[in-house]
Swiss-Prot record:
Coiled coil: none annotated. One of its GO terms (molecular function) is NAD binding. This is Acetaldehyde dehydrogenase 1. Keywords: Aromatic hydrocarbons catabolism, NAD, Oxidoreductase. Belongs to the acetaldehyde dehydrogenase family. GO terms for biological process: catabolic process. The active site is at C133. The lineage of its organism: Bacteria, Pseudomonadati, Pseudomonadota, Gammaproteobacteria, Pseudomonadales. SMART domains: Semialdhyde_dh. Its EC number is 1.2.1.10. Signal peptide: none annotated. NAD(+) binds at S15, G16, N17, I18, S164, A165, G166, P167, G168, T169, R170, A171, N172, N289.
Amino acid sequence: MDRTSSRCKVAIIGSGNIGTDLMIKVLRHGRHLEMGAMVGIDPASDGLARAKRLGVATTAQGVEGLLALPEFKDIGIAFDATSAGAHARHNELLQAHGVKVIDLTPAAIGPYVVPAINLDAELDAPNINMVTCGGQATIPMVAAVSRVAQVHYAEIVASIASKSAGPGTRANIDEFTETTSKAIEVIGGARKGKAIIVLNPAEPPLIMRDSVFVLSEVVDRDAIAASVKEMVASVQRYVPGYRLKQEVQFELIEKPANVPGVGLVSGLKTSIFLEVEGAAHYLPAYAGNLDIMTSAALSCAERLAERGKVRTLPSALV
């Protein structure tokens, strides 16, 4: 693996599914990144146990424990993979020490970032929000349509395996819908957005599936299809398991429909169906929702370190 001569040490706050998957990605694939600490609140968590076995500094005392670790002085980036409710305090403590924060909760204190859309535009922000797993999967498709047509309304449905949703994800369900809906508008380009999440209890667990429905002005359908395929390729650069389930579908809506928050609109309905297969770094391949979130966060951190937006340590010191 190609590793650069200087790397940024990172801390991961949250030793659940997302935090553990992210830790494994940093350890296996980090080019500009080095694991500095894994932080949790449950001493018996699998994530903390794995971190210890892999030689990563750990604490079960939350952010306060992280601040007390001797390794903290070298941390340049902290990933928060806890909950929206806890993030505000975590962010305040970390910002006070000059640590760049990548927020994997729906708290959305900082600007929304989806790497395929707006990564480079937000590198100077002290806190970057990764929206949600459903947002990372679907908002690129809304943006793909909005760059060739005015989007009146966009609705997404994210279906994930219940087994892939840990306590943190379940605690964030309400924030998931609110944050994803808003991000569909802010970076997806829709006048109005709506998000729905489904925790699928099927056994064996099913791969992450996402449906995206967009109502836009009438434009050339080939232009939309080409834009969608180009965007899929952009996401695949950091999430190889991201793909179209079938060809993009179109339907002309001639009779105006009343869209709450928008009013009466007609136009072209574009339906996009996706699936996201995980890399199986921690949970099996059905957990594409973990993989797209952690891969997006890793992509952001790598770019921050590469562009010198965070403190790094020379290779002799790491």
